[in-house]
Amino acid sequence: MRIAVIGAGKWGSALHLALKENHNCFISSLHQRDLEDFVSIKEALECEYLVFALSSQGMRAWLKENFINKGQKILIASKGIEDQSCQFLDEIFLDFVPKENFCVLSGPSFAAEVMQKLPTALMISGINQELCKKFASFFPDFIKTYIDNDVRGAEICGAYKNVLAIASGISDGLKLGNNARAALISRGLIEMHRFGKFFGAKEETFLGLSGAGDLFLTATSVLSRNYRVGLKLAQNQKLDSILVELNEVAEGVKTAYAIEKLAKMKGIYTPIVNEVVAIFKGKSVQEATQSLLKQND
């Protein structure tokens, strides 16, 4: 049995380190990297189990260009919604593999702490519960895994919390205090729940690892790149320059645009996301904050 992680960024590298503890695990990306266990894309696709840790915005293009379905079992470890199509990642993968052959990984997990082998808990979601159990068995003892079948809930929580982390970073960057941040996060959880319920996500997902757990982590720590984007926006830095300086993918940026478009199409009330997008488009953080404070629900 062989496992390959597709994507050699921080999260992909952390997953590779964890999975190789007890299994024959490789890592691959489009560009040659000087990494232990690195293999070509062609070699990686020969593995029976694939873990995808690519940018959500580049996932479809990568699959179109490189993927050959050989019955591989897939774990989607990326978090985001494709901006151009407003599709969730599981919808994108359905164009390439049957739904019985993939699961979604979610939960509160900073790559840096996984690399340090610090205790972590993750959720694996899929309609094929036996496959979920199989992927769960691959992880080492310092990672506790749970399984469920709420793929859509896991996808939405994993994507939405990144946008809320940007908003939380803005709040902290403006030095609005712990009370304000707590209010923002709790209202954000309600907003995420409202959005997710429209698409069929399950109630319990929002209060579990995929929802509240990942949101609380991502929205309160400078280890979160999305939170750091918010901090810099609060300093009146331009988004483009922030992303260049970051030199990493902040999934919450493109996902915010996708959620805003979906919410408008479906008539879902998403005030926090709307204000984050307005800030991206030039609205002052102070004005956006005042707009949120005036919201009644």
Swiss-Prot record:
Record-linked Gene3D superfamilies: N-(1-d-carboxylethyl)-l-norvaline Dehydrogenase, domain 2, NAD(P)-binding Rossmann-like Domain
Name of protein: Glycerol-3-phosphate dehydrogenase [NAD(P)+]
Name of the gene: gpsA
Residues the record marks as active site: K161 (proton acceptor)
One GO molecular-function entry: NAD binding
Entry function: Catalyzes the reduction of the glycolytic intermediate dihydroxyacetone phosphate (DHAP) to sn-glycerol 3-phosphate (G3P), the key precursor for phospholipid synthesis.
PROSITE patterns with a match to the protein in the record: NAD_G3PDH (PS00957)
Enzyme Commission identifier(s): 1.1.1.94
